[in-house]
Amino acid sequence: MTVRTPIYLDYSATTPIDPRVAEKMIPYLTEHFGNPASRSHAFGWTAEKAVENAREEVARLVNADPREIVWTSGATESNNLAIKGAANFYSPSKGKHIVTVQTEHKAVIDTVRELERLGYEATYLIPEPNGLIDLDKFKAALRPDTVLASVMLVNNEIGVIQDIEAIGNICREQGVIFHVDAAQATGKVHIDLQKLPVDLMSFSAHKTYGPKGIGALYVRRKPRVRIEAQMHGGGHERGMRSGTLATHQIVGMGEAFRIAREEMDSENVRIRQLRDRLLKGLQEIEEVYVNGDLEHRVAHNLNISFNFVEGESLIMAVKDIAVSSGSACTSASLEPSYVLRALGRSDELAHSSIRFSIGRFTTEEEIDYTIQLMKSKIGKLRELSPLWEMHLEGVDLNAVAWATH
């Protein structure tokens, strides 16, 4: 069987829309085009009903009350609304200190940096070498004036799953608002917001086979969590996020989350088998290092460093497969991955990392093709590397004193 190339193995960057999602969206672009805020006629009522049905589907996936779901333009906006909104609301009574992690997505890191510019203080925790955070270190980072903590559920680069329940319990004890970026988690891990001690949680549709440009923020009702709006005008979404709702996008997100809820368990079994097959094949190559914990990890992610190969040249060499080095949002810069550096990986290994992320439409044939392609291209690139030659000769490269020019 011939494999169609290029092969898409970058599902953590974005996913194709599931055909069932696209089909459900189209009528809301053409026939049911009303504004959900139009209360005086049937076009508006139809749109509003569709929006509320989708809200219920999003809530069902994470076991929340539909009234706790606020529509946004995506997880980046949700992160901004949650962190800035909660910090601004609670800082007068609590203080201006924020705790987060060095391996968070830039949408969290840069939001916290912006608050620092406005007079807040922030602590950026360093994770353990496996990517997980030490709970004692987290607890020690909290202060009497800590207003908010933000820890992602699933890391976008290395796929590790943090112990959100334990972290949330520590926050509850200390009266700290707890925000979780769950953009990479929906449809991959079970989320139960009735049980999890989480106050705010960000979601994205396009990481879960839904459309781009739509996301949501969970805002807890009991105990009630308050946030200050960041977008003003019209008072939509119970005053938390103004702007005409994009009915077709919202319908798409609802359908994507419905499918995720119904098919997640069986899908994860299949995807984990493919991931393990890929890992087994790539481990036959010498000097490969898996980044991040393999146990506490989502099924679809594999992040591997190939020593003595430069990441960018490797990506150019394997043009038949769509993979990434680092996060899609920051891989335009040639800096080594800040996530891998936070784990203590050397610049060389951080630079030689490739993130493979498998998804709903990946086949076994595509995985086998990828393994063969990687083996052949890495072999060729290493033949060109004087460092690889020295390694084969048994030279300890860490002990070499390199001359500067």
From Swiss-Prot:
Active site residues per record: 329
Record-linked InterPro entries: Aminotrans_V_dom (IPR000192), Aminotrans_V_PyrdxlP_BS (IPR020578), Cys_deSase_IscS (IPR010240), Cysteine_dSase (IPR016454), PyrdxlP-dep_Trfase (IPR015424), PyrdxlP-dep_Trfase_major (IPR015421), PyrdxlP-dep_Trfase_small (IPR015422)
Enzyme Commission identifier(s): 2.8.1.7
Residue(s) carrying N6-(pyridoxal phosphate)lysine: 207
Keyword terms of this UniProt record: 2Fe-2S, Cytoplasm, Iron, Iron-sulfur, Metal-binding, Pyridoxal phosphate, Transferase
Any one GO molecular function term: metal ion binding
Annotated positions binding pyridoxal 5'-phosphate: 75-76, 156, 184, 204-206, 244
Catalyzed chemical reaction(s): (sulfur carrier)-H + L-cysteine = (sulfur carrier)-SH + L-alanine
Annotated binding of [2Fe-2S] cluster, by residue: 329
Pathway, per record: Cofactor biosynthesis; iron-sulfur cluster biosynthesis
GO biological process: [2Fe-2S] cluster assembly
Superkingdom as given in the UniProt entry: Bacteria
Top-level EC class: transferase
HAMAP family assigned to the protein according to its UniProt record, in alphabetical order: Cys_desulf_IscS
Record's subunit section: Homodimer. Forms a heterotetramer with IscU, interacts with other sulfur acceptors.
Function: Master enzyme that delivers sulfur to a number of partners involved in Fe-S cluster assembly, tRNA modification or cofactor biosynthesis. Catalyzes the removal of elemental sulfur atoms from cysteine to produce alanine. Functions as a sulfur delivery protein for Fe-S cluster synthesis onto IscU, an Fe-S scaffold assembly protein, as well as other S acceptor proteins.
Name this polypeptide is given: Cysteine desulfurase IscS
Gene that this polypeptide is encoded by: iscS
